[in-house]
Amino acid sequence: MGLPWYRVHTVVLNDPGRLIAVHLMHTSLVSGWAGSMAFYELALFDPSDPILNPMWRQGMFVLPFMTRIGITQSWSNWSISGDSVVNPGIWSYEGVAASHIILSGLLFMAAIWHWVYWDLELFIDKRTMFPVLDLPKIFGIHLLLSGILCFGFGAFHVTGLFGPGIWVSDPYGLTGKVQQISPAWGADGFDPFNPGGVASHHIAAGILGIIAGLFHLSVRPSQRLYDALKMGNIETVLSSSIAAVFWAAFVVAGTMWYGSAATPIELFGPTRYQWDQGYFQQEIERRVQANIDNGNSIDKAWSLIPEKLAFYDYIGNNPAKGGLFRVGAMNSGDGIAVGWLGHPIFKDKLGNELFVRRMPTFFETFPVLLVDENGIVKADIPFRRAESKYSIEQVGVSATFYGGELNNATFTDPATVKKYARRAQLGEIFEFDRTTLKSDGVFRSSPRAWFTFGHLIFALLFFFGHIWHGARTLFRQVFAGIDPDLDEQIEFGTFLKLGDTSTRRQSV
C-alpha cells in the first residue's frame, strides 16, 4: 500500500480483529519489558547494605515499584527487610518477573492468532452484515472491569484482607516495611503522605468505576450526543484514551517529584525539597538536642543518630543534583557509601562555634563560608589569599567530629580543616568507595528524577496527541470537505479503510 510511517495505523481502521491483535501485542511488549528489566536489575542488585547502598542508589527502576506493593523477598534467599527467607514462591521478585514474561508470551501468541483470524463472525452486525464495534458498550465493559480491579486492589491487597499490604514508612524513611493499611475515610485521607488514603481512594474510585460501567452498559447515548462526540469513530477512543494517560502521567510525575505515601524515600530516594528545606538536618539537630537533654554527652548524642538518617542529609542523594543526562546510577558518580565519618563541629581559636553554609541544589561550585550563630561570616576559604581576612589559617579554625568513624577526633591542621569544610558543604560527611565501580566523582540522579522527567515528557507529548486526534475526529467532515447534510446514519470515516472497495460513500 506504500503507507508513510505516520499513517500505518489506518490498517486497523474498521478491522476489529486486528485492532485487538495490535493491542495484545503492545501489552505483550510492555509485560515482556517489565519482566526482562526486573531480571536485569536483579542480576545487578546488591542487597547486602540496605542502609548505605539502597536500591535507589544502585539505579534500580522497576524493583522499587515491586517493593512498594508488597514484594520483599528473592529466590536468592535475601530480603529487603533483612528477614529470613523461606520459600517465597511466586510472590517474590523473580516470581513476579517470570509471571510477566510468561504473560508476555501468551499475549504474543494471542496477538498472532487475532491477526491471522481477524474476520470473526463476532464482529459482524447481523442486521447490516458490516463489521462493527459497539464502542459505548466496550467503554462500559472497560470501566466495569477497571473499577472491579481498582476496588479489589484497595479493599483486599492494600488492606491485607487478601494480600500483603503496601510499603509504609515514617516521615524520615527509617522504619519502612510492608504492612496492612486501614482505609482513611476522613479529611486525613486526602493527605498525600497518609497511606490510608491509598486504600480509601482505590475503594472509592473502584466503586465509582463499577457504577459508571454499569451505567454505560445499560444506558445508550442519544443520537445527537452520539453524533456530536463521534462515538462511532475509533479515533474518538484513541483521543480520549490518550487524555486519560497524559493526565495520569502528569499526576504521578507530581507525586513522585514532590513525594507522597506512594513514593517512599526508602525506595526512590529523598526529594530535592528535603535538602532545600534542611528537612533531615533539622530532625538530626532535634534528636541530638533531645539526647543531650536526656543527660548524654555530645559525642554520645551524635553516636545515637541513625546512619540511615545521616545519609539522607547528603546532597549527593538529592535527585535534582545529578543532572538529567548523566548516564548511570548514583553509585557511578560519587561511589558506594562505606561509612559515616561523623558530624564535624568547627570552632575558631576563641572557641566560638562556626557553621558551614551548605551548597544550594543548583550550584556546581559554592564558596566555603563559615558563619556564626547570627549568620555573619567569620571564616572562609578565600579565592585570593593575598586579600584574605577570614582564612582558616587567620581565624584558627579547628574541626572536631562527633559520632561516626572519627568520633572525638579533632583536627587543627589548616589543610585538613579545609578538606572537611569543603565536604561539610555537601551535608553529612561519608566515606565512599570509588574504585569498585570506577566512579567518576560527578553526581548522578536518582530513579525519582528519571521517572519524573520521563513521565512529564510523555505527558506533554500525549497532551498534544490528544488535541491532534480529538480535533481530527470531531472535525473530520470539515477537514475532508464532506457535505454536512449527508443523510448517512454513521459519520464519515467509520468505514473508511484504505483499499476497501465496500466502504459506503452515500446512503443506501
Curated annotation (Swiss-Prot):
Protein name: Photosystem II CP47 reaction center protein
NCBIfam families found in the cross-reference section: PS_II_CP47
Family: Belongs to the PsbB/PsbC family. PsbB subfamily.
Assembly behavior: PSII is composed of 1 copy each of membrane proteins PsbA, PsbB, PsbC, PsbD, PsbE, PsbF, PsbH, PsbI, PsbJ, PsbK, PsbL, PsbM, PsbT, PsbY, PsbZ, Psb30/Ycf12, at least 3 peripheral proteins of the oxygen-evolving complex and a large number of cofactors. It forms dimeric complexes.
Cofactor note: Binds multiple chlorophylls. PSII binds additional chlorophylls, carotenoids and specific lipids.
Primary location class: plastid
Keyword Iron in annotation: no
Transmembrane segments: 21-36, 101-115, 140-156, 203-218, 237-252, 457-472
Biological source species: Bigelowiella natans (Pedinomonas minutissima)
Localization: Plastid, Chloroplast thylakoid membrane
Superkingdom per UniProt: Eukaryota
